[in-house]
Regions:
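Helix-start/capping segments and mature chain N-termini
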Residues: 2-11, 25, 32-206
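Short secondary-structure junctions
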Residues: 11-18
Length: 206
């Protein structure tokens, strides 16, 4: 069973805590036939890496410079080449995570994470119709914000407007929530820290 396979991988790698990824494809197929063989199963595992305590730097990049395809509705693709190339370029500029904007200069998402902004106690995050993934952590953050009376707006956020924001943070299952900053902009992250505190409380009690 899948559970026995996952447990075997955990046991072989001797990890008490970490991140495990399960991927199941439709199997091999030749180019001329719509018929697929037995599904292929891929399992990868890695230990939790050190998560920064202080706010991390993000770098805004034009996603049209990378081989990134957005689908509507979004899918979890296994092609990360564009994301990894952008991570490399981000790190060259001293950044932790790249944040993309599209051809219309609308913010979409990070290379492997979601981006959120706060202004006047309103939480802004890019709309799903832009072709971004609605991950587990993204939905959790929205739920937490709502529970502590922070208004939510899933909308178009223009690159030219980011410096007017009060706060910003990124999120993913692997890191939880990280406050962020960028060149010539920083924040005290008041509401960000409230959301993060509630997130840790939920994780601890789960």
């Amino acid at each position: 069973s899948l559970f026995s396979l996952l447990n075997k991988v955990i046991h072989i790698n001797n990890l008490e805590s970490g991140i495990i990824r399960l991927m199941i494809t439709r199997g091999d197929s030749n180019k001329t036939s719509p018929v697929f063989n037995m599904p292929c199963i891929y399992i990868s595992i890695k230990p939790f890496y050190s998560i920064p305590i202080k706010p991390v730097k993000v770098v805004y990049l034009d996603e049209t410079n990378y081989p990134i395809i957005r689908f509507t509705p979004a899918i979890k693709s296994m092609n990360y080449i564009g994301n990894m190339l952008s991570k490399r370029d981000c790190e060259k500029q001293g950044g932790y995570e790249p944040v993309f904007y599209n051809k219309d200069k609308i913010i979409t998402e990070c290379a492997i994470r979601n981006i959120f902004f706060i202004k006047d106690k309103v939480l802004y995050t890019p709309a799903l119709e832009l072709g971004i993934l609605s991950g587990v952590m993204r939905e959790t953050v929205l739920n937490i914000a709502e529970s502590i009376d922070i208004e939510i707006k899933e909308t178009y956020i223009y690159y030219d407007d980011i410096n007017s924001m009060d706060e910003a943070f990124i999120s993913s299952t692997g890191i939880g929530l990280l406050a962020c900053y960028w060149d010539n902009w920083e924040s005290k992250h008041h509401y960000t820290n409230l959301i993060k505190k509630e997130l840790f409380k939920r994780i601890k009690n789960s």
